[in-house]
From Swiss-Prot:
It catalyses: N(2)-formyl-N(1)-(5-phospho-beta-D-ribosyl)glycinamide + L-glutamine + ATP + H2O = 2-formamido-N(1)-(5-O-phospho-beta-D-ribosyl)acetamidine + L-glutamate + ADP + phosphate + H(+). Mg(2+) 2 binds at D122, D273. Its EC number is 6.3.5.3. Its main location: cytoplasm. Keywords: ATP-binding, Cytoplasm, Ligase, Magnesium, Metal-binding, Nucleotide-binding, Purine biosynthesis. Pathway: Purine metabolism; IMP biosynthesis via de novo pathway; 5-amino-1-(5-phospho-D-ribosyl)imidazole from N(2)-formyl-N(1)-(5-phospho-D-ribosyl)glycinamide: step 1/2. This is Phosphoribosylformylglycinamidine synthase subunit PurL. It comes from Staphylococcus aureus (strain JH9). GO terms for molecular function: ATP binding; magnesium ion binding; phosphoribosylformylglycinamidine synthase activity. Mg(2+) 1 binds at E98, N533. It is found in: Cytoplasm. Substrate binds at S99, H100, N101, H102, R121, Q245, E317, T318, Q319, S535.
Length: 729
């Protein structure tokens, strides 16, 4: 008789306990078919988390198959803890992005902190030392006190974990829209570097080899966290606060260093982070990859308190834990290492040849499941989408007040400087950061070399809602341009797909179309997808977020010497590369004036992106350019203002465009500053101005003139978010 009081198999079926765990009637019946019997309480819980949307991608797997995943530089693609890409000299870059949206909505500090901790462990589990962190965040508008609280908590959580563990946060992006009220998006990315011969895989093989648990003792925090992340947020979600994990960055630091030492041991067979679904996913996935079985003796698992049941142990998402498989007879070597780092560890099982996932506690069997169906045979749902009949009529922008529009956009939190927030992050711990958070991608030197890794993270929402297919192309191209802007060669990307409920036809269609656009852009821009994450059911009280695919992209700089004087100077000439058209669908101007997305859209020419990108990258590396800025949110006038304010330089510009086109967000444009005495030879580059040593920012068109003090612009741009967060109702 079990020492733990749990529902019987009959109660699970009759009272439909499995539904509370997230399994549908059909999924429960499939579990019964796989087992040839009704599952017990622990087995039901295990299937529920492994077949959750968060772990199985059961609604998104068909779309993910569209993405190109191989390429010249790819060493390891999707399927492991993170992607691995060659950077030459027997070195590789390891990177991935993950979401922690639902936990951050309920407990913003811990939700964000554990999101950072989890993505760090994904990188470390491959054997790489992390070199930088990035994040992509979405919140509701800041005139709402709840959104202010969420923003403050998330930023504090990101900084609190990253700063303590000693990894710089070097880049990110934050946008604000009422569609994220109560449902923030917190996507964390980590980048690491490794030598080829140290790359690890999450595999369990070799009959008789031992399974070692290391890290924090298992508690009851985070139970069913993967299931919680696969549901819509409702008024009852607050009661699921225990589903939010608790992070400990100081233990995280110890675990990181111990793991990086453990990978140097030849006796290590495989290693995986205990992330979503905790011990269940890490152990069963390792067994599946190794084509093996596992027997875990759960009484050996280090626990925080007595009485924790097998069900709770297997579903707990206690943070700062790793699972290792080591060669039999060499266990003590690893246990001694972990003891040296003051970490709890234990041998909790062994690899078998049964192809079954067996869990016992004091010799009583609590689960006996075939490995392959559990890990690889979750149901895949192909639903029906519904093409929306978009209104594509043109809005009227002919009578806008340029000055008023300029200042309203400049101080909107989406466009305003994020330094007030980023200053809470340690940006240079480790002393290898070359370009910090600001106007373009971050650049971090590869220690001991003259190489550097450029990284960026970018998301699109209004554009994707505007036209999912074109928006999907745009988000990949935006990341590509940001790497080009620092002279890097884009190598590969990771993605996080943040959407509402796929069971709604319109949202399912958004997934179909946007991933098709992303895949096309990846193919043409030669940026294969090597890792990623899907976060669905981002809805609050029945209202979906905007479809928000996020792309993290890395690039290689073979020699950083050209960055020594890569900063705009007085006397540099400004050029605009790329045509400016009447493109306002999904823009900040459209939001400011009309509020709703009108669905007028442009078609992105990906081939021209490559041509412009190569020309600009060459000009940077030849030392012709002192700065490159992509034209983004708010359009050309806002881009020029940010350039002027960020560097404290005067600017004088004359541009032959209309008033509205000052705020057009036509894709594929760059503003470049050419060093004094240098000549730029790029097709269709138009000289538009000069950087000066005055405090004057002056932009003239045939129809208007803006003339303001740079210091005033800087004060408004840099102070806007702080003002929003300190304003009382």
């Amino acid at each position: 008789m079990s020492k733990f009081i749990e529902p019987s198999v009959e109660e699970i079926k009759l009272e439909k306990v499995y539904q509370d765990m997230g399994l549908s009637d059909q999924e429960y019946e499939k579990v019964c078919d796989i087992l040839g019997r009704q599952p017990n309480f622990t087995e039901t819980g295990i299937f529920s988390v492994m077949w959750s949307e968060h772990c199985s991608y059961k609604h998104s797997k068909p779309f993910l198959k569209q993405f190109p995943t191989s390429g010249e530089h790819v060493l390891m693609g999707p399927g492991e803890g993170a992607g691995v890409v060659d950077i030459g000299d027997n070195q590789a870059v390891v990177f991935k992005v993950e979401s922690h949206n639902h936990p951050s909505a309920i407990e913003p500090y811990q939700g964000a902190a554990t999101g950072v901790g989890g993505i760090i462990r994904d990188i470390v589990s491959i054997g790489a030392r992390p070199i930088n962190l990035l994040n992509s965040l979405r919140f509701g508008e800041l005139d709402n006190k709840q959104n202010q609280r969420l923003l403050k908590g998330v930023v504090k959580g990101i900084g609190g974990y990253g700063n303590c563990i000693g990894i710089p946060t070097t880049a990110g992006e934050i946008e604000f829209d009422e569609r994220y009220d109560g449902n923030p998006l917190v996507n964390a990315m980590c980048v690491g570097v490794i030598n080829h011969d140290m790359i690890q895989k999450g595999t369990a093989k070799g009959v008789g080899n031992s399974v070692i648990y290391v890290g924090l003792k298992t508690g009851r925090d985070g139970i069913h966290g993967a299931t919680f992340a696969s549901e819509e947020l409702t008024e009852e979600s607050e009661s699921k606060r225990p589903s939010v994990q608790i992070g400990d960055p100081f233990v995280g630091k110890k675990l990181m260093e111990a793991t990086l030492e453990a990978i140097t041991f030849d006796e290590l067979v495989g290693i995986q982070d205990m992330g979503a679904a905790g011990l269940t996913s890490s152990s069963s996935e390792m067994a599946a990859k190794g084509g093996s079985g596992l027997h875990l003796r759960l009484e050996q698992v280090p626990t925080r308190e007595p009485g924790i049941s097998p069900y709770e142990m297997m579903l707990s998402e206690t943070q700062e834990r790793m699972l290792l498989v080591v060669e039999k007879g060499n266990e003590q070597k690893f246990l001694d290492l972990f003891d040296k780092h003051e970490l709890d560890s234990a041998v909790i099982g062994e690899v078998t040849d049964t192809n079954r996932f067996v869990l016992t506690y004091d010799d009583e069997v609590y689960a006996d499941i075939p490995v392959e169906p559990l890990a690889d045979e979750a149901p895949v749902y192909i639903l029906e989408g519904e093409e929306k009949d978009y209104n594509t009529s043109k809005n009227d922008y002919t009578h806008i007040d340029v000055k008023d529009t300029f200042f309203k956009l400049l101080k909107h939190p989406t466009i305003a400087s994020k330094h007030y927030l980023y200053d809470q992050y340690d940006q240079q711990v480790g002393a290898n950061t070359i370009i910090k958070p600001g106007l373009q991608a971050s650049v971090v030197r590869v220690e001991g070399t003259n190489k550097a890794i450029a990284s960026t993270i970018d998301g699109e929402a209004r554009y994707v809602y505007n036209n999912p297919y074109e928006g999907g192309k745009m988000v990949v191209a935006e990341a590509y341009r940001n790497l080009i802007a620092v002279g890097a060669t884009p190598l590969a990307m990771t993605d996080c797909l943040n959407y509402g409920s796929p069971e709604k036809k319109e949202i399912y269609q958004q997934l179909i179309d946007s991933t098709k656009g992303m895949a096309e852009a990846c193919d043409i821009l030669k940026t294969p997808v090597v890792s990623g994450n899907v976060s669905l059911y981002n809805e609050t009280k029945g209202t979906s977020i905007f479809p928000t695919p996020v792309v993290g992209m890395v690039g290689l700089i073979e020699n950083v010497n050209y960055l020594n004087d890569f900063e705009p100077q007085v006397g540099d000439k400004l050029y605009l590369i790329g045509d400016t058209k009447d493109d306002f669908g999904g823009s900040q101007l459209e939001k400011l004036i009309y509020g709703k997305v009108n669905h007028e859209f442009e078609s992105l020419d990906l081939s021209s992106e490559v041509e412009k990108g190569e020309s600009i990258k060459t000009a940077i590396r030849e030392g012709l350019l002192s700065h490159v800025q992509t034209v983004g949110k708010g359009g050309l006038l806002i881009t020029l203002a940010k350039l002027s304010a960020h560097y404290g330089l005067g600017l004088k510009s004359s541009i032959d465009i209309t008033n509205a086109q000052l705020f057009s967000e036509t894709q594929g444009r760059y503003v470049v500053s050419v060093k004094s005495g240098k000549t730029l030879n790029i097709d269709n580059a138009i000289e538009i101005g000069l950087l000066t040593d005055s405090d004057n920012f002056k932009v003239t068109t045939p129809y208007t003139e803006i003339s303001e003090n740079v210091s005033d612009i800087k004060q408004i741009w840099e102070g806007a978010i702080a003002q929003c967060l300190t304003t009382q109702d």
